[in-house]
């Protein structure tokens, strides 16, 4: 019987299997940052254990780092302590670290791919929900907790129960102006924030194949927002061309052998998925979230939903609570909703193509009066590339604030936050209550919509400028 992509990668990494027990998986790449690793390293230290494979472990500072004044000490004592702990732990255990201001520093899920560390057929873990980003390469990548971080550091293995498989097929081509971010928001709105629970989602279809690698990373990044364990896309020529020549990618005969193997990482024609979802690509349009979870999303051209339209009492109550927090009135056109802040960045949309999309919209235009716009590259390498292309000048000329690399306003763990009652259009991945700061209200959008919103001061599709 045929196997899915996820099943092939899983089976290739099982080092121990026993009835009634989780499979023991070998881990090819372990990514580490300052927030979920201190307790794990300390547990190793207390037990007198080394890191099993420091050569397969990479750390970077991203969550807590400021994106301005990066040459000064970190002001917040908790953030400073976590960053200092990571530096000491990496030095003590021989783990490679990209600290603030290092040319390779950045958000962990941006750094791995740009260095060619994320490759098809790998197992990749990190103490971070959005590790599924790396599934865009045909890797099985998922987030883990701090105790699991310790287990991987100590053994390079992880006990896991085999997940179910789901296919999300996006048929046809995406219309002009519709991006990977719109696609994944539409998927989550369709299946819900729990629709992927217990599954590894494989994204398929013409629309998915038409995405760039960076677009594919955006899609896989938000798989966790549908409740999925991971998201994957089978590798193809787009994947190979992205990886070719990157610092840690194979070369010469090793490259040829790798590509030959990578070509086998496709779901077999006779394989079956546990669940399948089909979405019509040509019918999609720019999406925006209106509520307090990523599944509460709709086309930007639609109105704020009416709770009365929901027959299920639980769903109706959820919508009522979300609208109360977001301070939105049912029936209001989403395109009339004004914002105070625009954030362009994060591991979802902080790559060079995202910045190019935003710059294309802002070029020759001005940010609306009184609006705060933060543009934060996902890594120092992305920052350097954007500056070499003059994108920073486009953003500054428009009135946006060009920052250094980091997670920034994606989450309220660093100086870049919303004030209570402020509303943002954000290219990040979560719009939970208080996610960007206590009392902050978040609308998730694509970089292009974020840039158009920056011009008008209200949620706007670029086509409407």
Swiss-Prot record:
Keywords: 4Fe-4S, Amino-acid biosynthesis, Branched-chain amino acid biosynthesis, Iron, Iron-sulfur, Leucine biosynthesis, Lyase, Metal-binding
Record GO biological process: L-leucine biosynthetic process
Known cofactor(s): [4Fe-4S] cluster
Its biological purpose: Catalyzes the isomerization between 2-isopropylmalate and 3-isopropylmalate, via the formation of 2-isopropylmaleate.
Annotated catalysed reactions: (2R,3S)-3-isopropylmalate = (2S)-2-isopropylmalate
Binding site for [4Fe-4S] cluster: 347, 407, 410
Name of protein: 3-isopropylmalate dehydratase large subunit
InterPro entries hit by this protein: 3-IsopropMal_deHydase_lsu, Acnase/IPM_dHydase_lsu_aba_1/3, Acoase/IPM_deHydtase_lsu_aba, Aconitase_4Fe-4S_BS, Aconitase_4Fe-4S_dom, IPM_dehydratase_rel_enz, IPMI_cat
Naturally occurring in which organism (per UniProt): Parafrankia sp. (strain EAN1pec)
Subunit structure, interactors included: Heterodimer of LeuC and LeuD.
Pathway: Amino-acid biosynthesis; L-leucine biosynthesis; L-leucine from 3-methyl-2-oxobutanoate: step 2/4
Gene3D superfamilies assigned: Aconitase, domain 3
EC number annotated for this UniProt entry: 4.2.1.33
A Pfam cross-reference name: Aconitase
Keyword Zinc-finger found: no
CDD domains linked: IPMI
Family statement drawn from the similarity comment of this UniProt entry: Belongs to the aconitase/IPM isomerase family. LeuC type 1 subfamily.
Keyword flag Iron-sulfur: yes
Region ranges (Disordered): 416-443
Any GO molecular function: 3-isopropylmalate dehydratase activity
Details of cofactor binding: Binds 1 [4Fe-4S] cluster per subunit.
């Amino acid at each position: 019987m045929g196997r899915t992509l996820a099943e092939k990668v899983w089976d290739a990494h099982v080092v121990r299997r026993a009835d009634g027990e989780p499979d023991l998986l070998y881990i090819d790449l372990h990514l580490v940052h300052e927030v979920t690793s201190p307790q794990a390293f300390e547990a190793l230290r207390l037990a007198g254990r080394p890191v099993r494979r420091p050569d397969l472990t990479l750390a970077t500072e991203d969550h807590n780092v400021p994106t301005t004044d990066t040459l000064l000490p970190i002001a917040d004592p908790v953030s400073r302590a976590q960053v200092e702990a990571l530096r000491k732990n990496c030095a003590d255990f021989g783990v490679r670290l990209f600290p603030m201001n290092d040319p390779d520093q950045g958000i962990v899920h941006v750094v791995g791919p740009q260095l060619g560390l994320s490759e098809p057929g790998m197992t990749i873990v990190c103490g971070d929900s959005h590790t599924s980003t790396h599934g865009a390469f045909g890797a099985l990548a998922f987030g883990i907790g701090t105790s699991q971080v310790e287990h991987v550091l100590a053994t390079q293995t992880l006990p896991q129960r085999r997940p179910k498989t789901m296919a999300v097929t996006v048929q046809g081509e995406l219309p002009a102006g519709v991006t990977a971010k719109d696609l994944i928001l539409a998927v989550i709105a369709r299946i819900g924030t729990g629709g992927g629970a217990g599954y590894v989602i494989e994204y398929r279809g013409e629309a998915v194949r038409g995405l760039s690698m960076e677009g594919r990373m955006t899609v896989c990044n938000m798989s966790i927002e549908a409740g999925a364990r991971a998201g994957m896309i089978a590798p193809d020529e787009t994947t190979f061309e992205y990886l070719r020549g990157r610092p840690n990618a194979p070369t010469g005969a090793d490259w040829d052998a790798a590509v030959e193997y990578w070509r086998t990482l496709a779901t077999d024609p006779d394989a079956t998925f546990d669940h399948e979802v089909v979405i019509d690509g040509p019918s999609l349009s720019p999406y925006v979230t209106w509520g307090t979870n990523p599944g509460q999303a709709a086309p930007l051209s639609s109105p704020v939903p009416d709770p009365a339209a929901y027959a299920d009492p639980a769903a109706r109550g959820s919508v009522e609570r979300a609208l109360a927090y977001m301070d939105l009135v049912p029936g209001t056109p989403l395109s009339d909703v004004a914002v105070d802040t625009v954030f362009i960045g994060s591991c979802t949309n902080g790559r060079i193509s995202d910045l190019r999309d935003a710059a294309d919209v802002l070029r020759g235009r001005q940010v609306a009066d009184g609006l705060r716009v933060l543009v934060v590259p996902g890594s120092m390498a992305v920052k350097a590339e954007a500056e070499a292309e003059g994108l920073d000048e486009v953003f500054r000329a428009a009135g946006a604030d060009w920052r250094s690399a980091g997670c920034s306003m994606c989450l309220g763990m660093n100086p870049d936050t919303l004030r209570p009652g402020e509303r943002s259009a954000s290219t990040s991945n979560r719009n939970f209550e208080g996610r960007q700061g206590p009392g902050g209200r978040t609308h998730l959008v694509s970089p292009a919509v974020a840039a158009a919103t920056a011009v008008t001061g209200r949620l706007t599709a670029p086509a409407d400028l």
